[in-house]
From Swiss-Prot:
Protein task: Bifunctional enzyme that catalyzes the decarboxylation of L-phenylalanine to produce 2-phenylethylamine, which is then oxidized to form 2-phenylacetaldehyde, a constituent of floral scent in petals. 2-phenylacetaldehyde is a precursor of 2-phenylethanol, another constituent of floral scent in petals.
Lineage of origin: Eukaryota, Viridiplantae, Streptophyta, Embryophyta, Tracheophyta
Record keywords, A-Z: Decarboxylase, Lyase, Pyridoxal phosphate
Gene that this polypeptide is encoded by: PAAS
Gene3D superfamilies: Aspartate Aminotransferase, domain 1 (3.90.1150.10), dopa decarboxylase, N-terminal domain (1.20.1340.10), Type I PLP-dependent aspartate aminotransferase-like (Major domain) (3.40.640.10)
UniProt name for this protein: Phenylacetaldehyde synthase
Disulfide bonds: none
EC numbers on record: 4.1.1.109
Binding site for L-phenylalanine: H203, H318, F348
GO cellular component, one term: cytoplasm
Top-level taxon of the source organism: Eukaryota
Protein family (similarity comment): Belongs to the group II decarboxylase family.
Keyword Lyase listed: yes
Source species: Rosa hybrid cultivar
Subunit relationships: Homotetramer.
Modified residues annotated as N6-(pyridoxal phosphate)lysine in this record: K319
Amino acid sequence: MGSFPFHRDLQEIASSQLTKALDPEEFRKQGHMVINFIADYYQNIEKYPVLSRVEPGYLKKCLPVSAPYDPEPISTILRDVQNHIVPGLTHWQSPNFFAYFSSTASTAGFLGEILTTGFNVVGFNWVSSPAATELENIVMDWLGDMLQLPKSFHFSGNGGGVLHGSTCEAIVCTMVAARDQMLRRIGSENLGKLVVYGSDQTHSTLQKATQIVGINTENFRAIKTTKSTGFALSPEMLRLTISSDLEKGLVPLFLCATIGTTATTAIDPLEALCHVAKEYGVWVHVDAAYAGSACICPEFRHFINGVEGANSFSFNPHKWLFTGMDCCCLWVKNPSVLASSLSTNPEFLRNKASDSKQVVDYKDWQIALSRRFRALKLWLVLRSYGVANLRNFIRIHVKMAKTFEGLVRMDKRFEILVPRNFSLVCFRISPSALISSNEDDEIGMVNEVNCKLLEAINASGKAYMTHAVVGGLYVLRCAVGATLTEEKHIVEAWNVVQDHAQAILSTY
């Protein structure tokens, strides 16, 4: 690595340094080196502190100020990855990673990504790579079957599915479709009257989508939830909010119901919410980003009962279906509504297949024109493990979460704040564990203690957890979901929690 000497040109580079951008034999050789590097990383992943300990700006001090003029060998680059990049990673695939929701990895997911990148096709329409489009059609119907989605969401019905990069993309696209469908009825001059609904537990993606789509930010409703409903959205509160908006002359447009909220995995009552929405002509999108994967298991499928009343449904296999970033599945009942809002057809893309209306052009189902061949890695995951193994992987995570939950319940200093629905346990040090408790500020003191506990856990490097604040209460989130996590890691994580709790409580 070094500075960029502008006075030199390629003629001055020794012939031995000239390289091809794509050489099959070099790819084979260097590919083996990279795969070995990644395999070694996974074998040694527990040696690293889960949460990176670097300071902001650390990397600029490690790397040159400009790109290298001459080529460098992959061995040198991998050495720098090990020395400079790995220390700056938060190790999401560590078995001691219990933060956020995991982004599960798998051998099949890795290999599928290699194939996707290796082929490097851009499947914006059918003719640009027929296999990319048709495989996506097939795997989306496969997954629809696994989730027991109504036929109205399948290509074999009148619906269909598409792979996006994130839930945000899925919600933006469906909200645009809902917006345009409504404005065709009431006139574009009424854009400022449209209202979007969610709960105070709905992912912030909904608010971002509302802003992107051009809906007045004052018309975004984050309906308050309470502990009495498990922090789920109340159909009665939705009805009251919609009625109030109608009295103001506003137009209810879009509802996002969540199956497995980020904070606590609360379950919005889908069937009842869809019933209310139908009365007012509101588009219902179901966000099951995390928990949707679990619904391939029969024992969790009931959580999406009522989905037949929704207009669209999405979940992220990159969260809990071992597919790797990025992969978001979106199904819609009426693809033509989506396409009418997102379709462009410039002359350079015109072709007989598209004109025949016999094929899907996925450019009309998303924001961007270009798109990756995401279906390939999803196909590899589904085929390599099968439905039975994928269900088993999810059940193992849930079982380990139950183990952690049991350990928490056995220690009287702690309490479980909300019911565990999947593999997330929300817990905290109980107010009763504090010897000196000022009733006037008990909530503040308990929140402070739990905040200190989380900071201590994460600073240890032995585990990484995150927090949520629900109903004004600060809770720790232990999200079991990393592919490599085993029962022993659950026990070790709990030991870390107990040790730091003891040290903190001794000061109160």
